[in-house]
Amino acid sequence: MRKLRAGIVGCSGIANDKHLPAIQRNGNFEITAFCDLFEERAQTAKETYGTPDARVYTDYRELLKEDLDVVYVLTPNSTHAEVSIAAMESGKHVMCEKPMAKTYAEAKAMVDVAHRTGKVLNIGYQCRYRADAQYLKQA
């Protein structure tokens, strides 16, 4: 089975602490593109987690021109909708870090684009099954 080609938009904090190590351990992905406003962060992520021919960008729109299966959106919360929508419109599936968006309207736009394009939009709500989250849900 072919590995999925992943692009990473946002290469600090949560990317290095959680997502990139997990993607690397998974074994079903190859990370072939990295983007961050600070090129050195993207370059460091590439050297640690990328394929030998992985490319580095400072503009996510350039990364979206790559032949990718999925884009991980690990950017500041205020940019989640913009980047996710652009990724789906360019033919990529999206894994977006939480929160999904700033407003209901942005979140709805993301879902609408996912339906229109047929792309998977996954939001990283990984805490919903923790004991404290389940307790609050039942309260």
List PLM regions with ranges.
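N-terminal Rossmann-like dinucleotide-binding module
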Residues: 1-50
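A contiguous active-site-proximal alpha/beta segment in oxidoreductase catalytic domains
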Residues: 101-139
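Short, conserved SAM-binding/catalytic segment
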Residues: 44-53, 109, 113-117
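Short alpha-helical
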Residues: 14, 40-41, 78-81, 102-105, ...
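Short, well-ordered coil/turn segments that N-cap beta-strands
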Residues: 29, 54, 92, 117-120
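Hydrophobic residues in well-ordered beta-strands that form the structural core
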Residues: 15, 58, 96, 121-123
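Beta-loop-alpha module in the N-terminal Rossmann-like domain of NAD(P)-dependent dehydrogenases
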Residues: 54-109, 113
